Amino acid sequence: MYTALQKIHKDKDAEPTEFEENVAQALFDFENTNQEIKSDLKDLYINSALQIDVSGGKKAVVIHVPYRLRKSFRKIHPRLVRELEKKFSGKEVVLIATRRILRPPKKGSAVQRPRSRTLTAVHDAMLEDIVYPAEIVGKRVRYRLDGSKIMKVFLDPKAKNDTENKLETFAGVYRKLSGKDVVFEFPLTE
């Protein structure tokens, strides 16, 4: 029997939480009710899901998808996010690929760490996942006098209509997942 629990695969046989089961059930229902997207959703599953409080009393749903399936999820991203936001009314949905950060190799060891497993690379890729379908066109890091850093991220103005109302959510999700402050802006066009 094909059930909603097959839509979630946790690491090392960990039990899914109640919220993760709700997200998996929503994916399962969406697959069964929508015929045009059924073939795209058939083989897709998620790793985990969590709810994050964003400023202003808003909540965001962060869904971690397997790294290998991120291209398939991106094909149906706009429709899937729209449907999930309807299901979890008032909450914005963000899809992020699951990535691992490896610690730096010990001094004197010959082991090389791939660039894609460094903290910087994982955080940059996470930022791109969060703002998808908008594209990042530039970044600036501002150092304040007290030593704190704030990153300004410029998004593609073409996606302004779709993403303008979600910028606060994006910043809150990124701050929660990486611990870094970020401000999203659209560059001024002459």
Swiss-Prot record:
Pfam families: Ribosomal_S7e (PF01251). GO terms for cellular component: 90S preribosome; cytosolic small ribosomal subunit; small-subunit processome. GO terms for molecular function: structural constituent of ribosome. InterPro entries: Ribosomal_eS7 (IPR000554), Ribosomal_eS7_CS (IPR047861). Keywords: Ribonucleoprotein, Ribosomal protein. GO terms for biological process: ribosomal small subunit biogenesis; rRNA processing; translation. It comes from the Eukaryota. Belongs to the eukaryotic ribosomal protein eS7 family. This is Small ribosomal subunit protein eS7. It comes from Avicennia marina. The gene is RPS7.
